[in-house]
Regions:
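Extracellular jelly-roll beta-sandwich "head" domains, especially the C-terminal globular C1q domain
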Residues: 2-104
Length: 104
């Protein structure tokens, strides 16, 4: 049975520097081992920049036995998906969050 799902994710990205010229991160959905068309996102993460929050959501058709994954790639090995501690009394900050919710 195929149903509609809202798929949302966020990544906390950081480029601490240390070499390399690239600043690009791409993220995309993969369903059953195949990249989902038109699901890629590209963002720049500048060296020594503050943390960048990349977020996106999709409405996609998913079957009960489908396997859904999120992939990412960067052209600079120093760029990280990074968790952090809360510094203002709040809880820790997760590196990645993904939510999948049935909408139809």
């Amino acid at each position: 049975m195929t149903l509609s799902f809202n798929i949302a994710f966020s990544l906390q990205l950081h480029n601490p520097g240390g070499g390399g010229n690239g600043t690009t991160v791409e993220t995309w959905l993969v369903k059953n081992g195949v990249a989902v068309p038109n699901s890629n996102t590209r963002t720049a993460v500048i060296t020594n920049s503050p943390y960048i929050l990349l977020s996106r959501n999709f409405i996609k058709q998913i079957d009960a036995l489908d396997n859904l994954q999120m992939y990412w790639a960067t052209d600079n090995h120093h760029i990280q998906i990074r968790h952090n501690t809360g510094t203002m009394g709040g809880p820790e900050i997760p590196s990645a969050i993904m939510t999948v919710q049935q909408v139809g």
